[in-house]
Every structure is written in C-alpha cells, then in structure tokens.
Curated annotation (Swiss-Prot):
One GO biological process term: 'de novo' IMP biosynthetic process
Organism: Staphylococcus aureus (strain N315)
Protein name per UniProt: N5-carboxyaminoimidazole ribonucleotide synthase
Keywords: ATP-binding, Ligase, Nucleotide-binding, Purine biosynthesis
Family of this protein: Belongs to the PurK/PurT family.
Length: 374
C-alpha cells in the first residue's frame, strides 16, 4: 500500500468527535494540518479543538459528502459507523483506514472466524442463532461460557456470563434480541494489549506491550511495560492479523492470558485505543501521532521508545470530585479531561498518566487514592 503524502496545511476529516477524535486532532494540528470533525453532538469534545465542525448523524449521506469535499483525507475514531456507508465514502474519498476492518469487526462471529483463519489463537466459540443452540454451547464449551451479541456492544454491554443452568434464562433473553456468539469462559490471569501502527508502504511500528485491568467491563488502568514476558508472542499474533486485514493507521489487539499462561486474541480495535493513552507522555511518539503520520502518508518511526515506565488510569464521573481535591498535591499526574458535557458515574470523563521508576508503588498509590470510588 502506497499513497501520496499530504502536504502540511492539508485538511484531515475526522468522523467522530469524542475523546479519540480530539486527541487525533491535537496530534494533527501540531504537525500543521487542519481538522474538520463530524459528530451528531453539538458539544462533543473534538468540536473545540477542530478548525471546523459539522453537526450531523453518522448516516447523514449529505453531511458525509460535505466532509469528504472539504478534506484531503478522512479518518474515523470508532467502529460504529455503517460499514456499507463507509464503503461508499471510500469509493469517492481518500480514507486510508478503509472499510474492510470495520465490516469485519462489526460482527463478532466474522471477526473470530477471520482471526482463527489467520492462524491466531482464539478462545473456543460457536455461533448461537436461536435458543436451541444453547444446548450445543453447553455440549461444546461446557460451563462457564459467555454469550455475546454478534453486533454492537462495548465496554461489556451486550453479553452475559452463564455459570450454570440457573443463568440460562439470561442467555435466552439476549438471544431473543440478537444473534449471538458463545465463547468459553477463561480463567484469566492477565489482560494485555498491543498497539501497532501500519503506515505507508506496509511500514509497521509497535508500541510496548500494555498490561490492563478492567472493572465493571471498563478499562480501569494500564501499566507499561506489561509485567509479563509475552511481547514476542503477541507481536507474532499481530503480524498474522496484519496479513489478513487491509488497514492503514493505528489499531490495538487485546489479549487474554489464562492460568496456564496461554495467550489468546480477544478482539481488535481498528483505531487508537484507550490502553494506548499513556503513550502521549511516556513515548517519543503517541499512538495518535503515528496514526496521523500513517493516514497522511508520512513515514513512521522505525521503533517507539518508551521514555519511562507509566501507569495510566481512566477517570470516571465518580472520580472527578476526588480528583479536584487531590490534583494540586500531585504535580506528577499528567491529566487529560475530555470536555464531555454529561457527567455520569460510570462514564469516561478523562484519564491521567504517571511516569514512574516503580510501577508497583505507583499502582498501590493509585489504589489508595481511588479505591474508595471504584
């Protein structure tokens, strides 16, 4: 894949004005690019850092074409835009990320089948189209297993854990609303992720392996470098995925490590990812920098340098009062507040990163500060 480099001063369009779009825009602007963002929310975070804002729904064909006509290249911050709509845009405008990854990843079953065909190790799974397929799931996977909707769902939404026969009713309810995928429940020892950017002429740049902790299905914190030696194995798995999916830009592969120390691919995020936010302060290039370099046709750095180990923690609505009281006492906290208008207890409102020589102690300090609010 090779395409013309954008000159400085060119215009980048971003579909989606959330925090990822905002941080993309900030990276683009420091490189000399202009930014136009499209989002349905009049007060989305990216609006206030973009040069121009188009308020429209993501399926508004007229508005999407308006974005395309204004911009030299288009990127997107999430995978919830219609793959068919994106395909039509790709036929008319320069969208290096393409539509294939979105088309693939919007369907959990197709995603898992593709990952399996690519030779990566995935958790055993089966398709569940109707309630009678649950018997097959019990026979094939055994208890416990997880039922997930094929389409939609994020941060743990659209899934139920089936521990035993008593939980089956919840699974039946989910299947009544959507086709599903059942997958074996793993005894997870660690969750890790690997962020990678694919650029012009198939250039590949890896970030350090990231160790993640989730709470209530939402990312709570990320530690870099991961405290487990799985980098080489994770890179091997990601390279197999890269050969199977057409994509330009930054993306992240999430992994499970089970109690037997086996590494499994969980899912792919075809854009910059929450677990890579630490890179803004902790690396010589952030995941947003490399994404912008990739979609504008610029060369990527040969490698990413981790300047210092780091702990990144998400800040939810319920954390903000504590944060305001403590922030002045902690100059080591690199704070990012996204500027979202609606404050909810479980909504991601920002994140902070701490650079440290002792991630274990910093982790303990964060627990001591924020444990009571989580």
């Amino acid at each position: 894949m090779n395409f013309n480099k954008l000159k400085f001063g060119a215009t980048i369009g971003i579909i989606g004005g959330g925090q990822l779009g905002k941080m993309m825009a900030q990276s683009a602007q420091k490189m000399g690019y202009k930014v136009v963002v499209l989002d349905p929310s009049e007060d989305c975070p990216c609006r206030y850092v973009a040069h121009e804002f188009i308020q429209a729904k993501y399926d508004d064909e007229k508005a999407l074409n308006q974005l395309g006509q204004k911009c030299d290249v288009i990127t997107y911050e999430f995978e919830n835009i219609s793959a068919q709509q994106l395909k039509l845009l790709c036929e008319k405008y320069n969208i290096p990320q393409g539509y294939q990854a979105i088309q693939l990843l919007q369907d959990r079953l197709t995603e898992k089948e593709t990952l399996k065909s690519a030779g990566t190790k995935v958790v055993p799974f089966i398709s569940v189209k109707e309630s009678t397929d649950i018997d097959k799931a019990i026979e094939t996977l055994g208890y416990p297993f997880i039922v997930k909707t094929r389409f939609g769902g994020y941060d743990g939404k659209g899934q139920v854990l089936i521990n035993n026969e008593k939980d089956l009713q919840e699974g039946f309810k989910l299947i009544e609303t959507s086709e599903c995928v059942a997958e074996k429940y793993l005894n997870i020892k660690k969750e890790v992720s690997l962020t990678v950017t694919r650029g012009n002429n198939n250039q590949i740049t890896f970030f350090p392996l990231q160790e993640n902790e989730h709470r209530n299905q939402i990312l709570f914190k990320t530690i870099v470098p991961a405290r487990i030696d799985k980098t080489a194995e994770a890179k091997e798995q990601v390279n197999k995925i890269i050969q199977s999916i057409h994509f330009i830009g930054t993306f992240t592969v999430e992994f499970f490590i089970d109690s037997n120390n086996q590494l499994y691919v969980n899912e792919i995020a075809p854009r910059p990812h929450n677990s890579g936010h630490y890179s803004i302060e902790a690396c010589d290039y952030s995941q947003f920098d490399t994404h912008i370099l990739a979609v504008t046709g610029q060369s990527l750095p040969n490698s990413i340098e981790l300047l210092k180990p780091a702990v990144m923690m998400n800040l939810l609505g319920k954390d903000l009062d504590l944060l305001e009281n403590e922030f002045n006492e902690h100059p080591e906290w690199h704070l990012h507040i996204y500027g979202k208008s609606g404050r909810k207890d479980s909504r991601k409102m920002g994140h902070m990163t701490v650079l440290t020589n002792d991630v274990n102690q910093t982790e303990q300090d964060m627990y001591a500060k924020f444990e009571g609010s989580n």
